[in-house]
Amino acid sequence: MSTNAIARRYAKALVQIGAEEGQVDKFNSELTQFNTVLAANAGLTSVFSNPAYGIEAKREILKEIIGKLALSESVAKFLQLLLDRSRLAFLPQITESYGNFADDLSGVVRPTLTSGLPLEESQIEEIKTSLTKTTGKKVMLKVQVDPSLIGGVVTKIGDKVFDGSVKTQLAKIQDILQKG
């Protein structure tokens, strides 16, 4: 089974529990918080992945971290399950998948808008409004500037890319000219 499939399975299970308890956003925050602590501490990550440390020692370390972060009982049990099943290494992918499932559940989409030049706030709002109408969801737009685009914009929503950049248009023209 692929890493993404495993991560999605665990994330979906936790989202379902979160939905039942009305705690989807809280679980997302706690999972992200724990993932950030783990990512920031390479020594901690190596302890959890090192077979030289026994499962009991790993459980004690995990309990201590859970206590310091004051995580909810459901997230604590979830993290203990990941540890017991040797799936803690998948936590970054699980956290990302959880965020995606939580967004779907709450009707949120997080597209990325990349432009060749900085956009004015009114332009960004106009694009955001258009995306809201197109997707039918609340839009949390991430705006980036990439001077290599020369001009225009590239919008990425999930795995769909809408490329209206000058760079791409020039590449298409060049391709047509080369083919003669």
Swiss-Prot record:
Q: Which SUPFAM superfamilies match?
A: N-terminal domain of the delta subunit of the F1F0-ATP synthase
**Signal peptide: which range, if any?**
none
Any idea where this protein resides? Answer: Cell inner membrane
Which key words are in the record? ATP synthesis, Cell inner membrane, Cell membrane, CF(1), Hydrogen ion transport, Ion transport, Membrane, Transport
Report whether Cell membrane shows up as a keyword of the record: yes
| Mode of membrane association | Peripheral membrane protein
A cellular component annotation (GO) from this entry: plasma membrane
- Tell me the domain of life: Bacteria
- Which Gene Ontology molecular function entries are recorded, alphabetically? proton-transporting ATP synthase activity, rotational mechanism
Q: Name one Pfam family in it.
A: OSCP
What biological function has been recorded for the protein in this entry? Answer: F(1)F(0) ATP synthase produces ATP from ADP in the presence of a proton or sodium gradient. F-type ATPases consist of two structural domains, F(1) containing the extramembraneous catalytic core and F(0) containing the membrane proton channel, linked together by a central stalk and a peripheral stalk. During catalysis, ATP synthesis in the catalytic domain of F(1) is coupled via a rotary mechanism of the central stalk subunits to proton translocation. This protein is part of the stalk that links CF(0) to CF(1). It either transmits conformational changes from CF(0) to CF(1) or is implicated in proton conduction.
Q: Subunit structure of this entry?
A: F-type ATPases have 2 components, F(1) - the catalytic core - and F(0) - the membrane proton channel. F(1) has five subunits: alpha(3), beta(3), gamma(1), delta(1), epsilon(1). F(0) has three main subunits: a(1), b(2) and c(10-14). The alpha and beta chains form an alternating ring which encloses part of the gamma chain. F(1) is attached to F(0) by a central stalk formed by the gamma and epsilon chains, while a peripheral stalk is formed by the delta and b chains.
* The family this protein is said to belong to: Belongs to the ATPase delta chain family.
Q: What is this protein called?
A: ATP synthase subunit delta
Q: Which organism is it from?
A: Geotalea uraniireducens (strain Rf4)
